[in-house]
Amino acid sequence: MYKVVVIIALLGAVKGLDRICLGHHAVANGTIVKTLTNEQEEVTNATETVESTNLNKLCMKGRSYKDLGNCHPVGMLIGTPVCDPHLTGTWDTLIERENAIAHCYPGATINEEALRQKIMESGGISKMSTGFTYGSSITSAGTTKACMRNGGDSFYAELKWLVSKTKGQNFPQTTNTYRNTDTAEHLIIWGIHHPSSTQEKNDLYGTQSLSISVESSTYQNNFVPVVGARPQVNGQSGRIDFHWTLVQPGDNITFSDNGGLIAPSRVSKLTGRDLGIQSEALIDNSCESKCFWRGGSINTKLPFQNLSPRTVGQCPKYVNQRSLLLATGMRNVPEVVQGRGLFGAIAGFIENGWEGMVDGWYGFRHQNAQGTGQAADYKSTQAAIDQITGKLNRLIEKTNTEFESIESEFSETEHQIGNVINWTKDSITDIWTYNAELLVAMENQHTIDMADSEMLNLYERVRKQLRQNAEEDGKGCFEIYHTCDDSCMESIRNNTYDHSQYREEALLNRLNINPVKLSSGYKDIILWFSFGESCFVLLAVVMGLVFFCLKNGNMRCTICI
């Protein structure tokens, strides 16, 4: 009976130990993210990094934009009638519409895509006269019904159609030179007329063979008009092909011809560098945006988007992914409901997380004579948040650069070049998608490792405070060997705990409690001692009975040698 009472009393002493546990925030249903080491890591919080939402409008608030409407960018240089309002000007955003008109008289512009992109990337156009003069037998006022202006026949505003003043008269040999006296390069564009018939050619330029030469220090070419009927376009069977080049500062360009030249009247100076947009989206002057694409505007602070690989402005990088989740919380270990055993339902971070701890990432739960309690640790929480705050912004800084990729429409002669460019863009997209996945996975790994590290730092801080006044249970908790009321628990949490104040009480309780703690190591020892003691007592009883019987003559022992 004595032994039973002692064991019950000692177990009561063990049960009476005060206890403090460290834990971290957890949620019932976390978010799955990718890390370097795990394809499906559950975290408490995550944010999307890929923008999938488009504004179906061009947000132009605060921008000095020029909407070309039906005018093609090339038409701004040659003076197509529909482009009359756009021959000069400055802008920070140039908007090109589909089905815009480049030529009124049928024809084509050689290297049109390269020319178009130069215009779309510019921030303005100014014009300077070439100063060309012509003899009295030449008229520079050729017109056509294909280029109507104000209800009458007209021509390109920036070009002169040179023809013989007298029908059928041979066009005289003519030479004109333009010198660029500016400090910037000038863009000069001219045309070659290909008559639809010999009769048309003879009426305009005479019966002689036609030849045009254009020469500068960087450009030389000779052209021969090709006579022949073509399918009618805008009522015309003839064609005008346009050519262009850049005249460097201090350089001259010379035109020599005897008919068939569409001569430049003014040269263009492209200034600045700004945005060019191809889009059919409507303009909205009430919203702002820094990124545009064919479908409208992309207004986002996210580092990636999956709307289009062809965007202009300060845009997120295009990735071929629907979603890339960036971890903004710690590893999630949902709380396991504890049965109320010897130490109640309190458990530490090594077993599981704590749900319901909404005021911090890390915290404490304690149990003492006054009951149980929970409190967040703001210092470690803030340390973790400081490292995660701005993580999305840092990701944006690593990926967002002003990037312009104007969608191209290639002619037949440029088709192979177009294929190469499109293949290159697809390859870049694949590379960026891989880079984005790797970058997000690295950031997620860092976030989780950092959060785990802060948890361990907090645990180490408490362990160093308690020293020998408590014992670790291996599950994230400390069993305290002295009475620790709520004030004492608060001192442990805020790092003001005085170890020496409780040393004597803790030492005494440790000596009283440790001998009877039935941990796995001591349990076997106690069992062996108990077995040995029982055997000894049994042997003593048997021997006593033998001696008693021998003494009374009830038993005789004969020893034979």
UniProtKB/Swiss-Prot annotation:
Keyword annotations from UniProtKB, A to Z: Clathrin- and caveolin-independent endocytosis of virus by host, Clathrin-mediated endocytosis of virus by host, Disulfide bond, Fusion of virus membrane with host endosomal membrane, Fusion of virus membrane with host membrane, Glycoprotein, Hemagglutinin, Host cell membrane, Host membrane, Host-virus interaction, Lipoprotein, Membrane, Palmitate, Signal, Transmembrane, Transmembrane helix, Viral attachment to host cell, Viral envelope protein, Viral penetration into host cytoplasm, Virion, Virus endocytosis by host, Virus entry into host cell
Site (Cleavage): R340, G341
Lipid-bearing positions (S-palmitoyl cysteine): C557, C560
GO cellular component, one term: viral envelope
Segments crossing the lipid bilayer: 525-545
GO molecular function terms noted in the UniProt entry: host cell surface receptor binding
Cytoplasmic face residues: 546-561
Major place of residence: virion
UniProt signal peptide: 1-16
Disulfide bond entries: C21-C477, C59-C287, C71-C83, C104-C147, C291-C315, C484-C488
GO biological process: clathrin-dependent endocytosis of virus by host cell; fusion of virus membrane with host endosome membrane; fusion of virus membrane with host plasma membrane; viral budding from plasma membrane; virion attachment to host cell
PTM remark: Palmitoylated.
UniProt topological domain (Extracellular) ranges: 18-524
One Pfam short name: Hemagglutinin
Localization of this protein: Virion membrane; Host apical cell membrane
Membrane topology, as annotated: Single-pass type I membrane protein
Residues annotated as glycosylated: N29, N45, N252, N422, N494
Quaternary structure note: Homotrimer of disulfide-linked HA1-HA2.
Family: Belongs to the influenza viruses hemagglutinin family.
Other facts: Major glycoprotein, comprises over 80% of the envelope proteins present in virus particle.
Stated role: Binds to sialic acid-containing receptors on the cell surface, bringing about the attachment of the virus particle to the cell. This attachment induces virion internalization of about two third of the virus particles through clathrin-dependent endocytosis and about one third through a clathrin- and caveolin-independent pathway. Plays a major role in the determination of host range restriction and virulence. Class I viral fusion protein.
Protein's UniProt name: Hemagglutinin
Gene: HA
